[in-house]
Curated annotation (Swiss-Prot):
SUPFAM superfamilies: P-loop containing nucleoside triphosphate hydrolases
Ranges of compositional bias, category Low complexity: 168-178
Biased composition (Basic and acidic residues): 1-10
Gene3D superfamilies: P-loop containing nucleotide triphosphate hydrolases, SWI2/SNF2 ATPases, N-terminal domain, Tandem AAA-ATPase domain
Main location: nucleus
InterPro entries per the UniProt record, alphabetical: Helicase_ATP-bd (IPR014001), Helicase_C-like (IPR001650), P-loop_NTPase (IPR027417), SNF2-like_sf (IPR038718), SNF2/RAD54-like_C (IPR049730), SNF2_N (IPR000330), SNF2_RAD54_helicase_repair (IPR050496)
A biological process from GO: reciprocal meiotic recombination
Subunit note: Interacts with RAD51 and DMC1.
Name of the featured protein: DNA repair and recombination protein RDH54
Signal peptide: none
Organism: Saccharomyces cerevisiae (strain JAY291)
Amino acid sequence: MQIPKYENKPFKPPRRVGSNKYTQLKPTATAVTTAPISKAKVTANLKRSISAGPTLNLAKKPNNLTSNENTRYFTIMYRKPTTKKHKTWSGDGYATLKANSDKLCFYNEAGKFLGSSMLPSDSDSLFETLFKAGSNEVQLDYELKENAEIRSAKEALSQNMGNPSPPTTSTTETVPSTKNDGGKYQMPLSQLFSLNTVKRFKSVTKQTNEHMTTVPKTSQNSKAKKYYPVFDVNKIDNPIVMNKNAAAEVDVIVDPLLGKFLRPHQREGVKFMYDCLMGLARPTIENPDIDCTTKSLVLENDSDISGCLLADDMGLGKTLMSITLIWTLIRQTPFASKVSCSQSGIPLTGLCKKILVVCPVTLIGNWKREFGKWLNLSRIGVLTLSSRNSPDMDKMAVRNFLKVQRTYQVLIIGYEKLLSVSEELEKNKHLIDMLVCDEGHRLKNGASKILNTLKSLDIRRKLLLTGTPIQNDLNEFFTIIDFINPGILGSFASFKRRFIIPITRARDTANRYNEELLKKGEERSKEMIEITKRFILRRTNAILEKYLPPKTDIILFCKPYSQQILAFKDILQGARLDFGQLTFSSSLGLITLLKKVCNSPGLVGSDPYYKSHIKDTQSQDSYSRSLNSGKLKVLMTLLEGIRKGTKEKVVVVSNYTQTLDIIENLMNMAGMSHCRLDGSIPAKQRDSIVTSFNRNPAIFGFLLSAKSGGVGLNLVGASRLILFDNDWNPSVDLQAMSRIHRDGQKKPCFIYRLVTTGCIDEKILQRQLMKNSLSQKFLGDSEMRNKESSNDDLFNKEDLKDLFSVHTDTKSNTHDLICSCDGLGEEIEYPETNQQQNTVELRKRSTTTWTSALDLQKKMNEAATNDDAKKSQYIRQCLVHYKHIDPARQDELFDEVITDSFTELKDSITFAFVKPGEICLREQ
């Protein structure tokens, strides 16, 4: 670096600001005349004195902007001085430079004067110089050249020029006369530099609105600033414009970066969620088939709503819709006057600054990847807490997230980790603008610490995502709804009195023919639907059929081995069941044991119920040596056929880790490469296991625990899935089966469900097909289709007795219930039944005051027949479009893997229901 050489120069007197050269004024020694002088004479003499003497460049007040064509205009950026490494500008404005002047005057975008600064000596560095103006640092952006830009700048600067400043000096006052030897006037030095400013009178009392002068509203609004949306709707193809209320100042338009990827149902979902979080009432849509997402409707406010429950089926893109909503609220707001805006009136910040996303720990990595996929992490700051962090490091990271504004906007955290940092979140809860809860059905327990922690944060805008919000418990339903929109259903006591009691009574099998109770229950159900549909959105995955590859569903009924039949008989005899006292809760242990027998008799010996109630050592030894079963035989044949006949991967799902152990051993013996995910896998390893399976072509199989690992996973690397056993809750199986048929899948999918013929496996399948009625009614899948199925999720004594029955003389008990066809692969069309009318007639006849024993027995028989008919009808409705195939008569199962392996499986498969995909149908 070159250091300038020191030179001892003589002192240079300072010059006045605004003067191009140094001027020294000396007072004269002439005697002052005391006689008064006329004003005109003083003025004339003063002009002569100034013109004859040295030139004085008297600075004018910068705000006095006259229409001077030689004035140059610039745009500027300004900020307060800061020592930050990454500096940002806090505002925009203008600068003016008058002709023959070396001073820049700076103003903010509203025309307020910020300060002035001298031009740099080097004119080439004009736009690189950092000027000091008052308490701000200022830098020139560019010079305005276009007439329209200059006119706009003049208008902005003239807003603060309504009241011109008073003159700095008075030329009309009588001044004493001073003469020098040359007969010329000179002003005294003290008077020349004194500023006689006129101060406005300041009232002693504080002014209130009552003392203010009333200005007409029209004149106030005439100069009101205009605001514009972040995106120009005219430059976007098929834009998504959000609805608004009457107070909105600007439209909110979804960023086309995301909007162009959204499907029609996702566009509707984003608008629905936005309306709910903004507290807008639902619009009245006459024709739901018309796309209303391109128009902004002015809606009334709904003060009861500030949250939303998105209950779409798995695979409909709930994560993408949520990211779109988050990005929209971070960048935009309808109330532009409440945030900082650019000089052109575009909001610079959005409605939300900090957003908290809470999800299962297995989905944290997936959420961050989705943000990176759709937005790029350079656009939005996403913070996740590392699993290697200590508790203190986590707390510090959360504190920094909330207090540092511009680094991170989104915090993704697991439900369990939420408890450890709850104190930091609660201290700064006013900084959190929005809460997103993925897999929100985990909050259904009112006593949950996680739920109470989230409630204590008191975040107004809440979004819950779930594919299974409710099955059959209205208490859990109330807990979730009251968390989303507190108080909308009233207190729990009033909710129980008004809704739970009448609906539960109507669903009780003992009241199935009580017309009054059923009518009241139906009325309360409809009332609840009207309340909750304002903020609950539920769509099924049927709308994905036109976007995803075809999917073929195959239900295979597997013949049980003789050892399995023997195990069923021994267990049922040893249990000594008393069906008169038996309930579903008391028989859960026995049900689980029988399900294990369906998977493999070798699981019996380690079962707790078997050890405590049966303890047959001789039978146990014979079972433990028999690891095979009908389903295991079919499974291994399918796996071998998939490996040899295709280049596809496969996912095997079970509800029991012990069953996965057996399958894993068999796959190891067969030399099938695989990976596994269950409850024993640490959370930090799960994401890497899924990624490895999807990307590594050498991995053939994926063993998945339905309950421990089936939440939110994306396994599109596989195109075939085998559900080895069933769960009582149909949503568990549906969620597990949806792991492969979702966005990102490129191949046709095949879903296999294995069921042991005539055993408890098949009874569970039948219950699954009949269930979901309560969920469908309250979430809007179908309001009337399942109107009569309000009690189909309850067990009576006959149901339990049938549950423990083993049918060895049937090819499919399910097919026997619904159809009498020959199983030749035809799709059966069922005639409409008059079931509802028969049910109503039975109800009316059961309300008579007296009946004889003979009539009572007749009615009981009719009721039993009616129940069987109803059960058949519900199962039949769920199996619409399925082909009925008896392998003894038809060897085409619409799948090349099963067809090629049919010689091995012919004795192991007793029946099949097949719902072919589009490709299979075209090939036929």
